[in-house]
Amino acid sequence: MIHGQLTTLRAIEREDLDALWRWYNDAEAMYYWAEPHKTMSREDLDGRYGAGLSASTGRAHWLLITTREEAGRGETIGRIGYVDLDRRNRHTEIALMIGERDYWGRGYGSDALIAYLGYLFHELNLHKVWLRVEAFNERALRAYEQCGFGRDGVFREHTFLGGRYYDSIIMSILEDDFRERYPFVAPGTR
C-alpha cells in the first residue's frame, strides 16, 4: 500500500469491480478520462480485470485510490497506474481518475498523485513520469501543474470526443524536480 495524507493506494480486488463498473458507465467521468462513453457490461469488466486484479504485466500496473482511514478501509474513489513502463530509459506514462464525483476538485487526486510519484521515483527509480491530458480538462491541468508537472508539448486534435477533436497536452515531471519540490515524501508514504 502507498499512503498519502488523504488517500491510500492499494491493489484492486474483486469487490472493487462494482465501483469500477459504475465509473466506466458514468458518461461525465469517462469524458474527463477522455474515453468515448459506451456502456460496459459487468461481464466485460470482469473479463477486463478478472485475470489481472493483483497482477502487473511489468509494463503496466493499476492501483485503486481510497480515502485514507486510520482504522479500517476507506471509501473507493478512483484509480491510478502506469502504462508503458520503460525501465531502460527510466520513464513511464501515468493516468489517474477520480470516479466518485463527490471527491472531484477536493485535492484527493493531487494527494494520490504525489504519493504515487514518491513510489515511482523512490521505489522504481524512474527519471521521468509523464502524462496526457485533454486541453478542455482545465481542472486536471491546474492540478498537474500544482503538483510540479510542466507542459512538454501538444498532440494537436488528438482525441475525438462528442463529435469533435481536442488537443492532448503532454506533461512531465523529472525525478530531481520532484525531490526538490517534495523532499518530505518518503518512499510509499506522505
Can you say where each PLM-predicted feature lies in the sequence?
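Conserved catalytic-core motifs of GNAT/GCN5-like acyltransferases
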Residues: W130-V133, G150-Y166
